[in-house]
Structures are given as structure tokens and as C-alpha cells.
Amino acid sequence: REGSAYRKVVNENDITNILRKKGFKIINPQLYKIDEQIEIFANADKIIAPHGSNLANIIFCDPETKIFEIGPNYIFDFEKNIKTKYEKLANLSGLKYFKINADTVNVKNHSKIAMKYVSKKILDKSSHFKNMIVKLSDIDL
């Protein structure tokens, strides 16, 4: 989630080091043209990514591709649709979906756009607007 104001994985470097040792290629989809993103996702056997719009690219994956979504534990009713949208997309696409639950860390400074359109109460309470820490033992793919 490079460049994002929230849902960053605080220990991302530790995770990417583990994944590289397991043979994963680490990419930032935002740095690729859409046709390159399609090719990358279409040729992947496994995708591991934090919750965010880049996961929409899983629609280009072959059936049976394993999708590992890193995300917080959403607990509020208003977070229900957020919680399951990529799981539903994976299931509709015939993919194998797995969730890696992350602990949350408060964000000190929310983006101006978030502060303009989202109530302070939601920004402060919702896991959607926090950063994440993943237990390294959970990266056992």
C-alpha cells in the first residue's frame, strides 16, 4: 500500500524478505500499466496483498490461484461489505481465498480527503483507517 495514508503494513520489509526467500516476486501494481498488471496476475499461482483496490486485479487470475489477503479484523456492522468484498470476488472467480488477519495500529494523520468525507468517529474506530502489523508466523504459505 505504498503511498497510502492508511492500511500500510508496518512490518512490510520483514514480510517481503520472507516472501522473497520463498520465491515470491514482490511488485507494486501501481508501477505497471494495466496490460502488464493483467499479465502478472494471470500468470501468478499465489497472490499475497494487503486489503486494497489492487486486489481487484484478481479477476485476471486463473481459477485455483491462491489469494492471501492481509487485512484487519473488521468488527463493526458498517464494515461488513469491506470485510468480504475480495473474498466474494475470489469465490466468484473460482479462486482459493485465504485471510491473513493483521493487528491494527492507529494512524496519526489521516488524509485530507478522508477527514473531509469520513466522520472522525469512524476514522478513529474503524480498522479500515488504521495501519497493520502482521505476525511473521502467519506468513506460512
Predicted regions and their residues:
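Cofactor-binding loop segments of dinucleotide-utilizing enzymes, especially the Rossmann-like FAD-
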Residues: 1, 70-72, 102
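Active-site donor-nucleotide binding/catalytic segment of nucleotide-sugar enzymes
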Residues: 1-16, 27-32, 75, 79-86
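Extended, non-globular alpha-helical segments
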Residues: 12-27, 32, 108, 114, ...
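Short acidic loop-to-helix transition motifs that present clustered carboxylates
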Residues: 30-36, 53-54
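Structural alpha-helical scaffold elements that stabilize or flank donor/cofactor-binding regions
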Residues: 39-40
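A donor-sugar binding/catalytic signature common to diverse glycosyltransferases
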Residues: 43-90
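Leloir-type glycosyltransferase catalytic cores
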Residues: 84-141
